Structures are given as structure tokens and as C-alpha cells.
């Protein structure tokens, strides 16, 4: 099972549970305070996931390390590829 399928199954289970609880399909009588929290729960979860993603990307960008050796190696490979393509008649 791919990661996408796992996420979709998880979202389907959470969504169906939320829908069943909010519509009363299970026959449970939830207190009014629980119902008031339950209705906007998907929006809260979406905003929380967005904040987590933004924080993770920001942290990874802030702690990104330069790979100077790999950059030099890549530049030399690019030069070799350009020279090979120039020998084969490709003009840049």
C-alpha cells in the first residue's frame, strides 16, 4: 500500500467518524459542549497541519547545510556533459 493510500484511508476513517458523530447516525446523544467542539474540528485539524508543515519547512530551511564538495563534483560533471555534447555537435 502506498503512502498516499494510507493517508486517504486514514482521512476516510476520520471523516466518516466525524460525519457519523455530527449527524447523530450512531445514535449517541453528545452533550452540547462536545457538539460545539466537534463541528469545527476539521478546520482546526487542517490549520494545525498547515502550521506544522510551515514550521517544519522553516526549520529545515534554517538548518540547511551547504554541500560544497558535492556542488564542485556536480559542476565538473556538468562540464563533462557539455563537452561530450559539444563533441556530438550540440551547440549551447
Swiss-Prot record:
Domain of life where this protein originates: Eukaryota
Coiled-coil positions: none
Pathway: Protein modification; protein glycosylation
GO molecular-function terms, A-Z: enzyme activator activity
Keyword Endoplasmic reticulum recorded: yes
Location within or outside the cell: Endoplasmic reticulum membrane
Pfam families, sorted: DPM3
Subunit structure and binding partners: Component of the dolichol-phosphate mannose (DPM) synthase complex composed of DPM1, DPM2 and DPM3; within the complex, associates with DPM1 via its C-terminal domain and with DPM2 via its N-terminal portion. This interaction stabilizes DPM1 protein.
Name of the featured protein: Dolichol-phosphate mannosyltransferase subunit 3
Source organism per UniProt: Pongo abelii (Sumatran orangutan)
Gene that encodes it: DPM3
Amino acid at each position: 500500500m502506498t503512502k498516499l493510500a494510507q493517508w486517504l484511508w486514514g482521512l476516510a476513517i476520520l471523516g466518516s467518524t466525524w460525519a457519523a458523530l455530527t449527524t447523530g447516525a450512531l445514535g449517541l446523544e453528545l452533550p452540547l459542549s462536545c457538539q460545539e467542539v466537534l463541528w469545527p474540528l476539521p478546520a482546526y485539524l487542517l490549520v494545525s497541519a498547515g502550521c506544522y508543515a510551515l514550521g517544519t519547512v522553516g526549520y529545515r530551511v534554517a538548518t540547511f547545510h551547504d554541500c560544497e564538495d558535492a556542488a564542485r563534483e556536480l559542476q565538473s560533471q556538468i562540464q563533462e556533459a557539455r563537452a561530450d555534447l559539444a563533441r556530438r555537435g550540440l551547440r549551447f
